[in-house]
Amino acid sequence: TEWLPNILTDHHEMGTNSSFFFQPGVPERKNPLISDLNQALTREIGTYHEKALNSIGSLYYSEEDYDDFFFGKASTYPDANGSIGILFEQGSSRGHIQESVNGILTFPFTIRNQLTAAFSTLEAAKNMRVKLLNYMKDFYDDQIELNPKSSDNIVFGKLKDESTVHHLADILNSHKIKFNKISEAVSYTHLRAHETHND
């Protein structure tokens, strides 16, 4: 079976003197491939975090410090795949208890904030179920429309390191990108500079 979550959360710690962060991140530092609707849904989910964190008296912030740009991050990768990725960053107690500019910070307090945000995410997912399902459906429908079948072909390979090709094939397979092994030698007449690596 395939796992396609509607929301994926990524829980981390940050510097002790910080409070609690949740996405969306800095608006100007969003990957241009992430839709405005994705950010609007992330912001709407954020209202659930606000309410929950207010109810326990915890400080928090959003739309500062952290980006939503690099797709290699656990909180951004879902955004490129029809899901909503959310990063949580909790000021770290660096053990059981530590002083901070906001007062004494304890390990149980940091756990409580992360758990509260996890529960508020579940509440948002339940209440926004139809929106999130429609968002994912529309995301995949749009990808099909934006990427019609093309007759263009890309040839890739690496003569000195076949394992690189096998690893790339694994990645392509995991994303359901179809490819075939060529059956005969290929010669090129028009190559761009980045395509002429001989190794």
What are these model-predicted stretches?
Residues T1-S187:
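Metallocarboxypeptidase
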Residues I154, T196-D199:
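Intrinsic disorder/low-complexity detector
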Residues T189-H197:
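Conserved small/polar residues in nucleotide/adenosyl-binding loops
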